[in-house]
């Protein structure tokens, strides 16, 4: 609660979207409809109404944490969102919801930066008067009994006319005169109760006891922040094989040659694991063996050697100029480059020698390596952010700015939950205040408080628990959580990562690879694939492990994508079609509008999404069984689809091209050998109905 808060003449409560009582800004992107809700009330029977006041404050990102040294201090968001200069607002009338005293409104930001909104409550004397007079007329009261009421109405209309442009006032003036003219009460009140006057007063209401609500912030990113398709590749694995069949270390040039295929599949972000020099001290060997053999390339996450640190490129990949050429090639292919920001060091990283204070030094004088007892990681030194925050904070900022200067606008941050939250709040604000288009993906497979806490601090997107959600009830609960936290968290659903090969993929065959791709690409608006997924790579290092056998983290893994495609042993065409469907349907860019539908079979899952702007609607029915057919009766929530229970309609399956005539209940049968899912193009939802659905309480 802000200091000095007092109750207003009109009560304003339960405003949304508000994150952590207004401590952090909510999230949106340019062109996204932001729904606003508030409870507005007053005493007695008098009517109240509400107005949504929206402002754009520019591109300064809120400083939610104080940095070290001379960095500008943190400023509470409640102070930041108070405009320091007069900014012309948008003033939007809010509508009553289904629940008494609940009002709804929407706004659509059209620029990147910080937006604010507040809800103003006010007494609506004309609505109060209209309700009372209509009730008395219906009760049959006489002109004598109603005379005072009608004269009060005339005064109210005259007051209201003062706030209406002169050329538009006539209906109000005429209605007021009619109220003052003796005669039949229905005739006297007719003009004042007419739709024409009601519409005019909707635009120019007479407001009493106006009470300003709290001002709240919404940080608005560019559209990629909400809608993105990621493909992870190791540049060093793109060199192919020599004449003896041995892998050849790839370069930025060979990696650039792989970009057209990635772009053809419809991905718009290519994510690179660390591209820096790899430590030689305690380097890990193949399959994470403690001892590296001659020629072993090591883990890219063991960053730094005598060849450089976080601001250098691995010499076997090329030079910084070669990296610039790779970024340019990606841009030409319609791809953005996401770079891994892994804040950890190999023992021979330059920082270990030059800045031992950035690490934890043990009593014997050695630097502590990473541990997750009983596991030990001698090839990694964790950073200590408390010994010299001024030096370390600014060095990381320098590194991030260095890569931004080389065309990187997206960072995938490795294990951010192992670094202090104030550091991330400070770093993200420093970076986005220079370039608000920079995006950060949080790779935080951790407890909800940390995952969502990092999202609140400014991370654009977040990895999630999706990988481990496989049962129908788990996926339903997970999807509902996506909508619940959409105001501050944007999930990026990865089907696999270099670290995680889920057991469902190890044993589920090609069908499970297709199933998980459907779920990831349609449940959330952002999803990701790690290279090799399209080849159905499924062998783990041992039973019960989620680590890949011959993991690419520790060795080169060139792949024959074209050969697999020619043999019909590739998921590439299916991934391509999924991304085509995502681009075709704005509904699949939404987080808030997911709705699950009933199937009496736990091996089948159904959910729909709609786009508030266009009414575009998609229904997904997907099997969770990759091995055989599943069938059921699907009961649609017709209201959630903007329809009446008795409606019949045609749908088109975007995967197979087949069309069906459906209604409220439908027989469905999914045969994985043919297609693991229906992704159905549904009828458009009309404007008023989709607005009502967006405002569901």
Swiss-Prot record:
The active site is at 414 (nucleophile), 443 (proton donor). Its EC number is 2.4.99.16. Disruption phenotype: Cells lacking this gene display M1P accumulation and trehalose sensitivity. These phenotypes are suppressed in mutants lacking both glgE and treS or both glgE and mak. Deletion of glgE does not increase glycogen content. The gene is glgE. It is an enzyme of class 2 (transferase). Pathway: Glycan biosynthesis; glycogen biosynthesis. This is Alpha-1,4-glucan:maltose-1-phosphate maltosyltransferase. It comes from the Bacteria. It catalyses: alpha-maltose 1-phosphate + [(1->4)-alpha-D-glucosyl](n) = [(1->4)-alpha-D-glucosyl](n+2) + phosphate. It comes from Mycolicibacterium smegmatis (strain ATCC 700084 / mc(2)155). GO terms for molecular function: hexosyltransferase activity; hydrolase activity, hydrolyzing O-glycosyl compounds. InterPro entries: GlgE, GLGE_C, GlgE_dom_N/S, Glyco_hydro_13_cat_dom, Glyco_hydro_b, Glycoside_hydrolase_SF, Ig-like_fold. Changing residue 349 to Y: In SMEG53; results in a temperature-dependent accumulation of M1P during exponential growth. The transfer reaction from maltose-1-P to glycogen is inhibited by micromolar amounts of inorganic phosphate or arsenate but is only slightly inhibited by millimolar concentrations of glucose-1-P, glucose-6-P, or inorganic pyrophosphate. Is also inhibited by ATP, by 1,4-dideoxy-1,4-imino-D-arabinitol (DIA), but not by isofagomine. Keywords: Carbohydrate metabolism, Glycogen biosynthesis, Glycogen metabolism, Glycosyltransferase, Transferase. Maltosyltransferase that uses maltose 1-phosphate (M1P) as the sugar donor to elongate linear or branched alpha-(1->4)-glucans. Is also able to catalyze the reverse reaction in vitro. Cannot use glucose 1-phosphate as substrate. Is involved in a branched alpha-glucan biosynthetic pathway from trehalose, together with TreS, Mak and GlgB. Belongs to the glycosyl hydrolase 13 family. GlgE subfamily.
